[in-house]
């Protein structure tokens, strides 16, 4: 071990004695595991739920073609042991969010190192490390950009201390009625996949939206004008999946319904097209007449990289038909009630989305996109670069050595930029910021105000949309602070399922009510103040009032804010950078930029920001017996106003 021999004796001993948790065995994880064992770390635990795909092989060098389909964590362990047989590595093919990996599990480790590609897992590991009191080194890459930061309870900002831009969403009426950008058509195609072959979601409907306020039309009159309600395409208001099943997933009938009849139906909404170019319906028969059939492009005849070619409309129609037939067969093989899950690396699923999206783009007069472009946009993919992962994994180890040497004050958030800044720096270190006193996770008393309509929000929505999605809880328990200890939501299976579809107002929740939400796995408690409003914006179910403010207007010099996602769909790490022209990255600390609020100034994506309740102020986690919701009384109704 050449590296450990060059370390001071005390640090070398700490390295040998330490036990590290590596979360993620992908692009960064492979490089990190290699660096750790070559540095002298021998006691490692690595966890990853993912399996190896062919697309991983160009940069995740611990894997080979023969490993495709196997656990990343297990194969990474086997590969590392080939060049470091003395290492003691434990591999877990599992999700880090599994309740088995509780606070006691995390307390086994000297520190944790994240090599993740999704925000939900990052939030969870952040909270578990705070609860266990161990340092966490966070990291992320996006193309040429990268970042490494250190998180230590009570000393630095936690991962959720600063706001992150939420993933961009689009109004349902835009997706369904008036797409104006290719991404709108791609989102529609992904929704269509789920509506036909996957789990149906009412929020992912693809049929024309007759409730579009911009249309302001008379549906009855329009339906009379539309000569497409019950002919061929059967534009009856049944679910898309029911209709598709009734046709036996006939590709031609699906094509004519989606790209002819539904478009004709849209054209009857006159007002939508007064200032827009109206869509042009497609007809299967006209696309496949003799003249067009001769123009259909055979993939095998395409020169160059076929995934980067844009086909013609007839070819995309043919691709749509072939992919529907393949997916139909996959459903049949799985049996009744089976569902498919869309995966960007599944060829038939990707072909389906590519074809459907491009046909819709053509209908709405947009330039069509290659399969490569559609895949990048559909998966929110920023192509990963092996060199970036290598640089970032090296920086993770350097920060880890600082922690083990007892020099946490020397730790830095380091940004890797695509281009050198005027000072010719590619690596830019910034001082670590102290905890944000307003953070929803690591503040002394986590508390938040949520604005919503108590007469419309259900218990299920409170659990799924607010607590799990917004506040990233895994298994929340919710108690109403009404003096009775009413249990609204229980993490025990089936205990409060009867409440799910009831409005929260039915439980006496009104303006100024307080809810205590506990996640026992994360050792996290959040007090939620309810602010009732009858005037929520359209398509907005709730708002977090006074979301964590960003720290000042500071802006990373020379480089605009970007999101670091490690090539994933929900990103997570800040990116801004400056450059460094020295080979020895250890000297980055000597050339610090002015305080940058490492996480505030960069686009750490999505997720919610929360606070952590310390042990000394933690509310007892003993679950209370569920109490039935109070009987509604007149004064309750008056109080709601």
From Swiss-Prot:
Heterodimer of sae1 and uba2/sae2. The heterodimer corresponds to the two domains that are encoded on a single polypeptide chain in ubiquitin-activating enzyme E1. Interacts with ube2i. One of its GO terms (cellular component) is cytoplasm. Pathway: Protein modification; protein sumoylation. The gene is uba2-a. It is found in: Nucleus. ATP binds at residues 24-29, 48, 56-59, 72, 95-96, 117-122. Belongs to the ubiquitin-activating E1 family. It comes from Xenopus laevis (African clawed frog). SUPFAM superfamilies: Activating enzymes of the ubiquitin-like proteins. The keyword DNA damage does not apply. GO terms for biological process: protein sumoylation. Disulfide bonds: none annotated. Residues 548-561 have a biased composition (Basic and acidic residues). Residues 562-579 have a biased composition (Polar residues). Keywords: ATP-binding, Metal-binding, Nucleotide-binding, Nucleus, Transferase, Ubl conjugation pathway, Zinc. GO terms for molecular function: ATP binding; metal ion binding; SUMO activating enzyme activity; transferase activity. The active site is at 173 (glycyl thioester intermediate). Residues 582-594, 630-641 have a biased composition (Acidic residues). This is SUMO-activating enzyme subunit 2-A. The lineage of its organism: Eukaryota, Metazoa, Chordata, Craniata, Vertebrata. Its EC number is 2.3.2.-. Zn(2+) binds at residues 158, 161, 439, 442. Residues 546-641 are annotated as: Disordered.
